[in-house]
């Protein structure tokens, strides 16, 4: 494989992020369940950030035995990880909604879709902001 580009060259102005999605009816009726999910994710995420070598070894041993640990470590190092507190700050200061809007704009422009929902409308950080103290 040949590396064509390194996305870190565009950070922090742009980022490729993952996330969670829920239907509106599920979100409205299951806020406590979603808050528990957020708190559980935050605990696991913060553990991985603070103990990455141990966490990668555990992931490889317990879930990805067919994948060499060196490959898992390489994949881990290729991403930028943030603590749950860092995410809270970036949710609060609109960093994340701006990154999401960039992704939305890219996909909509390349799909030639003219009418789409802005990120500030479909992204609701309120549960996360309440769950992470």
Predicted stretch roles:
Residues 1-8:
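Ligand-binding "clamshell"
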Residues 12, 27-28, 88, 114, ...:
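Generic, ordered loop/turn and secondary-structure boundary motif
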Residues 15-32:
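A bilobed periplasmic-binding-protein/Venus flytrap-type ligand-binding module shared by bacterial periplasmic
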Residues 28-112:
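Secondary-structure end/capping motifs
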Residues 6, 23, 83, 122-128:
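Helix N-cap / beta->alpha transition motif
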Residues 12-13, 17, 101:
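Bilobed "Venus flytrap"/periplasmic-binding protein-like clamshell domains
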Residues 12-14, 77-80, 124-127:
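Short secondary-structure boundary/hinge segments and terminal tails
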Residues 100-133:
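Conserved C-terminal helix/tail region of periplasmic/extracytoplasmic solute-binding proteins
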